[in-house]
């Protein structure tokens, strides 16, 4: 059975590397501009009067490799923007501006135009301004193109959504993803291109080509989630990216997140699992599995969240609930994420 680690990505090693880096960051300004207490959350924030200024930075990862293989670059900028704005809204902040960074080996005007179109589509869907950026020609350092960006968002101090209010009895509403989004591409490429010997134009069993599936842009959840925050007492928000539902532990770490009512898994994930003989646990630790964003609310507010999401043409479902503890093989587990799928219970550590 192939794993994400076999494809060159070790998420546990990445966690250790991040901790090693963060352990050396000790300086902090000694004035009124102080960081918010959001350690380990989706975004960082600093005080600015009655507001927090929120910053997120991210890129598109190896999805760009598929774009180069297909010679199609107009969707990956949407992914880059989505990865940033979807993180920013996890603390209730409204994204307002973006700066981008593009590193290139060499680039044509056609590719630049495609990237520009994608940037425009992404900022329009997110309702943000692109206010600057940098393009670096680095022929001796990289091959192809890499694209990243940083988003600025704002939130009133008394409106921040930290996840600390999440408690047993709350429901988890899952918002449908558009597909693979921007995580797990290394494993997907290994399965499709190395194991199954397909190419970007190969048709999968459900009719779409490999390129169509892998280059479908990440869903941008800004508009529905900001509307939810205005209308409902939202307790926790989670962008389901690398690591899958493990991301829920970025919220209240003292409870259990039980995912036991998942909707039908999207075809792209079935294709990857079947062609690569990937274990259920590995799939759920690598991919979003059809749920790109989670909203945690009181039981009585779940239907309103689903209604708002559906209004924005994003299917939504109650996929689980918050519990004090969960049972697995006769053992009581606390402070964890439990996923039930295919009559199997899996702890997402």
From Swiss-Prot:
Catalytic activity: 2-formamido-N(1)-(5-O-phospho-beta-D-ribosyl)acetamidine + ATP = 5-amino-1-(5-phospho-beta-D-ribosyl)imidazole + ADP + phosphate + H(+)
EC category: ligase
GO cellular component assignments: cytosol
GO BP terms, alphabetized: 'de novo' IMP biosynthetic process; adenine biosynthetic process
Top-level taxon of the source organism: Archaea
Pathway(s) of this molecule: Purine metabolism; IMP biosynthesis via de novo pathway; 5-amino-1-(5-phospho-D-ribosyl)imidazole from N(2)-formyl-N(1)-(5-phospho-D-ribosyl)glycinamide: step 2/2
Single GO molecular function: phosphoribosylamine-glycine ligase activity
Pfam families registered for this protein in UniProt: AIRS, AIRS_C
Keywords, comma-separated and alphabetical: ATP-binding, Cytoplasm, Ligase, Nucleotide-binding, Purine biosynthesis
Primary localization: cytoplasm
InterPro entries named in the record: PurM-like_C_dom, PurM-like_C_sf, PurM-like_N, PurM-like_N_sf, PurM_cligase
Location of the protein in the cell: Cytoplasm
EC number: 6.3.3.1
Family affiliation: Belongs to the AIR synthase family.
Name recorded for this polypeptide: Phosphoribosylformylglycinamidine cyclo-ligase
Organism: Methanococcus maripaludis (strain C5 / ATCC BAA-1333)
Lineage: Archaea, Methanobacteriati, Methanobacteriota, Methanomada group, Methanococci
């Amino acid at each position: 059975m192939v794993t994400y680690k076999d494809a060159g990505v070790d998420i546990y090693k990445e966690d250790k590397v991040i901790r090693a880096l963060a352990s050396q960051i000790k300086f902090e300004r000694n004035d009124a501009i102080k960081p918010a207490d959001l350690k380990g959350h989706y975004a960082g924030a600093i005080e600015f009067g009655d507001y927090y200024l929120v910053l997120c930075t991210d890129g598109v990862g190896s999805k760009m490799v598929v774009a180069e293989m297909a010679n199609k670059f107009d969707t990956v900028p949407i992914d880059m923007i989505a990865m940033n704005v979807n993180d920013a809204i996890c603390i209730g902040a409204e994204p307002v501006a973006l700066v981008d960074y593009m590193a290139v080996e060499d680039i044509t005007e056609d590719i630049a135009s495609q990237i520009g179109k994608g940037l425009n589509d992404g900022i329009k869907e997110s309702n943000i301004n692109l206010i600057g950026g940098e393009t670096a020609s680095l022929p001796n350092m990289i091959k192809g193109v890499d694209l990243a960006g940083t988003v600025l968002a704002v939130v009133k101090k008394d409106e921040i959504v930290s996840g600390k209010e999440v408690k047993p009895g709350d429901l988890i509403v899952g918002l449908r993803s558009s597909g693979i989004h921007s995580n797990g591409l290394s494993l997907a490429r290994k399965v499709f291109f190395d194991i199954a010997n397909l190419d970007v134009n190969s048709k999968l069993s459900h009719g779409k080509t490999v390129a169509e599936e892998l280059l479908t842009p990440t869903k941008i959840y800004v508009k529905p989630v900001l509307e939810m925050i205005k209308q409902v007492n939202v307790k926790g928000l989670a962008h389901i990216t690398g690591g899958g539902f493990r991301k829920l532990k970025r919220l209240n770490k003292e409870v259990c997140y039980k995912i036991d009512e998942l909707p039908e898994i999207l075809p792209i994930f079935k294709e990857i699992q079947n062609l690569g003989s990937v274990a259920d646990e590995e799939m759920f630790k690598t991919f979003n599995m059809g749920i790109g964003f989670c909203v945690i609310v009181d039981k009585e507010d779940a239907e309103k969240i689903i209604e708002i999401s559906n209004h924005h043409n994003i299917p939504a479902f109650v996929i689980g609930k918050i519990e004090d503890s969960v049972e697995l093989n006769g053992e009581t587990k606390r402070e964890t994420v439990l996923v039930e799928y295919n009559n199997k219970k899996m702890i997402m550590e």
